[in-house]
Amino acid sequence: MEQDKLIIRGARENNLKNISLEIPRNKMVVMTGLSGSGKTSLAFDTIYAEGQRRYVESLSAYARMFLGGVEKPDVEQIEGLSPAISIDQKTTSNNPRSTVGTVTEIYDYLRLLYARCGVPYCPTHNIPITGQDISEMVAQVMSLEDGTRLTVMAPIIRNKKGTFKDQFAKLQKDGYVRVRVDGEIKLLEDDIELEKNKRHNIDVVIDRIIKKEEAKGRIHDSLETALNLAAGMAIVLEGDQEELFSSNYACRICGFSVPKLEPRLFSFNAPLGACDTCKGLGFTEEVDVDLLIPDKELSIREGAIRFYKNIVDTENIEWQTFETLMKAYKISLDVPVKKLTKKQMEIILHGSDRPISYKITSSGGNTYMRNDYIEGIKDMIERRYVETSSAMSKDWYHSFMIESKCPTCGGKRLNEQALSVRVGDRNIIEFTEQSVVNAMDWLEKTELTETQAKIAEQVIKEIGSRLRFLKDVGLDYLTLDRLAGTLSGGEAQRIRLATQIGSRLSGVLYVLDEPSIGLHQRDNAKLIDTLKNMRDLGNSLIVVEHDEETMLNADWIVDIGPGAGIHGGEVIFNGTPEEILKSEDSITGKYLSGRLRIDVPEQRRKGTGKAAELIGVSEHNLKHINVKFPLGKLVLVTGVSGSGKSTLVNECFMKAVQQNLGYTRIHPGKYEKVKGLNNIDKLVQIDQNPIGRTPRSNPATYTGVFDDIRSVFANTPEARLRGYDKGRFSFNVKGGRCEACWGDGVKVISMNFLPDVYVPCEVCHGKRYNEETLQCTFKGKNIYDVLEMTVEEGLELFANQPKIRNKLQTLCDVGLGYLKLGQSSTTLSGGEAQRVKLASELQKRATGKTVYILDEPTTGLHTDDVKRLIAVLEAIVDTGNTVIVIEHNLDVIKCADWIIDLGPEGGDNGGMIIAEGTPEQVAENPNSWTGQYLKKTLKWTKAKKEKKQK
């Protein structure tokens, strides 16, 4: 009998406190708890990791060498474990070739559809291009009336310049007698004179035949000769009427040809189909004059050209060469660049149009004579960017460049041949430019021929089912050509979820990380139904989630806590949703039952009375909207998924402010004009990206408190006696660190086909510093001991050090008191990383004119963490600053001073302002999806508050 429970015994991974529990199989199980409580450690680092390890262990040593090893999690035993698949929030891919269509495999099926059912059309004449075999051509000719006089010709030259003397001589040598030149029959034995610079059409007369049944073989042979001579083309002339035949896919009028249709012709990753200019990327990188010359008021000698700024009037060879170019064309180095003529700018950017003789003196005093073209600065940077192998040089050259739409394909990635093929009224790229919902509609309505329908039946079924799965997980607004790297974590996760649904696996354990992220409440029910469908196929689901609706729809809930970090790691509750509502121990249960809640503020802030305004915003799907962001308030930008929130805030507003503050390389989205940006003197974006990419980065180094701690240690009696400065207490530089492990505390041992093994350094025993440094102590603790402390413990140790105490207090204020000061940044969750950034910003002096931008800050946060986050955001606003938040969480939305709600739907049907105002005003707007859900929340919160007061 199959085991109906997943049994975990003795789980001790990260902060888990030797926990044991049983959870049902083939059910939807939600794991919840405060941020940092250990739910991810249990779900991903223990259960999924063990499932993955068992799979890898079952493979041969040779296969394991390529897969890499999976370390055994710190758990005594797991029973009843199925093959495990993880669907997390990591962005799908930053590869510019990866799109929604390729990730979901829809594009693979589309390529097959267009290869088998597509019809090429001439891009110039808009007529279908068809290829015939010779028997079809003969049959068409034989359908003419008997006695019809025919001339078979081979079109060898089409619309080309030249005299073609050599071609005429060869044709005569091969036995041909007549040619038709520009519509006029001529004898090859005559001296045919053609204008060299005029375009000509030349056809070779192969045969003149009277159509009759006995001539069928002769017609076949003549057509075959013509096809061989003219690369698959033949003309049959009947009086004044002529018919162009082609064994290729070629236009009968202009000869535009298409290779044999096959799936790789429609791949922008294959040379056959990719645009030759951009190689299938859809964009090219070129030097932007505004980045090269940011201030055109300056002269070249004053450093107007950023590339030469630091080498003006030096012996640098690059400057000598450039100065020679300027002298050769008498271009002044001392007039403002804006006064230079268009021709002079052409010389500066693209170089000389003739060779120049000049001499170069090297730094060693040697003189070299040269006579050559001198390259322009723009052309030189673009050439070097491609040629250099140095990452540093590449970054330097790239700082002058921008991405621009490919001039050849117009951003469509494919070459003209691939784009000429249509199914119905669209080519393959036009299909991918549609949103998921529009693509579904088009597939249903497009009429195919009987043959096409039969061929395409299974392919269309596969495409349609994948589109439906995307719609079911709330992604119907996405276009199939959307770059995977531009997706949010939640969108990327739901795409992988849709792909898994499409595979229809059963008997699998799926581990998901907050699939509801980025999803509006309206779409949540569809996602929950999708998860239930996966369960009903015979799969087990473990969902790490904070969303109340998802929890209440689960079959089972595991609550990890009671607190975070060292205060968590225990199973607080393990049972059904009905039971958790009555639990006295579970903080989650108290919020779900309404015993705990986040209160609505008593009153909304008035703000400063000033606003930043964008007029005529039309980037992506935004419909030429005018938006006011009131300053000195907590502003929430809301709307269903894909309605344009991130485009408005991140692409348009934020970049407009950054540009106004003097940031370079910033290109805001489309808008007509902007007002009120002078009321903002600083902009801070606080996202959930890691605070550091290496294990050496940690909360103490990021917030700057470690500098202060090192200063304290440098002032201890022992350190002063030995002459140590604060650099001695850094694990990143020589001096105080252990040189055996370079301050890492561990050494990596490569095991070839086994996973790398990390062993504590045998010299410092994992303490990162050398013995002399560790002998310096503060209140009995050395520098290693401090890094191993939690923020709360550090607060106690440094209670009499105001500078350190204040910085550590801000970390506690944002709910991170449980973090170790030296905890590697790579181990922090997105929510934790964001709060470390918040704490770092809170330490800085408020200007009162700062704008903070946060994109879905509640990701990874329990309702209790959200309560703390709201308090922090309100503290920032109370100092006169502005906080703009993109969010779906109703607890945050109801605490806003001002809401901008976009919609009404996602994608093409979004991009309009549906409602603006206080939460109470938006809640009364019947057209706002957010308002409808907000109205229920405000009523529910008010009712609970009144009940408690009674």
Report residues per predicted region.
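Conserved phosphate-binding elements of NTP-dependent enzyme cores
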Residues: 1-950
